[in-house]
Amino acid sequence: MKKIDMLTPIGILIGISMVVFGVISSGGNERFLAFIDVPSILIVLGGVFGTLCVSFPLKQLKNMGRVGKQAFQSKEINVEEIVGTFVHLSEKARREGLLSLEAELEQIDDSFVKKGILLAIDGVEPEMIRELLEAEIATVEERHARGRSMFEKAGDYAPAWGMIGTLVGLVLMLKSLNTPSSLGPDMAIALLTTFYGALLSNLFFQPIAAKLAGKTEHELFVKEVIIEGVIGLLAGQNSRFVQAKLKVFAPVEKRKLEEKREHVREA
């Protein structure tokens, strides 16, 4: 079962809470209700959806919900675990040969690791392995970019549709200039679509696109670590060398902690 990335919903709730707090603290509950206007919301959401339909094929749009859900899930692979796996595999490969690693495949969940090890067992040349695995990385990156682009475009479109809604409201307001008492309320309603467009863009669409970009970056980084581990296995590098080489990819803070622990053990 995938864990929930709590920072995403918490961040959205914090943003909404600050807006609600600012409105209520300035004018009370009645002022807050003035910020709720269903037609304005429909103009922005409907307009964004319409432009997304024009911009992307149906097959891609169907996946928008699934792609967006990734921003609310936490499934980051631990780099330290990957390093530990390849240290263990390199020890076994040096003792028993590369063919012995076939028995370890059932215990490995990551399909990318499995694919790399199978290529190594089959005796594929290191450069060919690197080329094949990097081609897969490029495919993953392109697929993620396509999914993320829907949220990036929605973030661009939302403020524009907010402005369109405001223009519609202003036209309607100007047509009722003969009733000055309604100008203030009509102007407020006209501006609400701009408010909704800016809010959706800066609190939902763009942040989700940024979160997805960060997750993609981490996934590609882990796959690069795996490639180096597979090449090390094929080259018959000893476990200490593999560990030292792959540790370079670990976060700086964790590397420093490991170095301190090693110094303590040596002392």
From Swiss-Prot:
Organism encoding this protein: Priestia megaterium
Record's function text: May be involved in some transport function.
Gene: ytxD
UniProt keyword terms in alphabetical order: Cell membrane, Membrane, Transmembrane, Transmembrane helix, Transport
InterPro entries per record: Flag_MotA_CS, MotA-like, MotA_ExbB_proton_chnl
Keyword Transport annotated: yes
Record Pfam families: MotA_ExbB
Transmembrane segment boundaries: 4-24, 32-52, 154-174, 188-208
Name of the protein described by the UniProt record: Uncharacterized 29.3 kDa protein in ccpA 3'region
Source species taxonomy: Bacteria, Bacillati, Bacillota, Bacilli, Bacillales
Stretches of the chain found on the membrane's Cytoplasmic side: 209-267
Domain of life according to the entry: Bacteria
PROSITE patterns listed in its UniProt record: MOTA (PS01307)
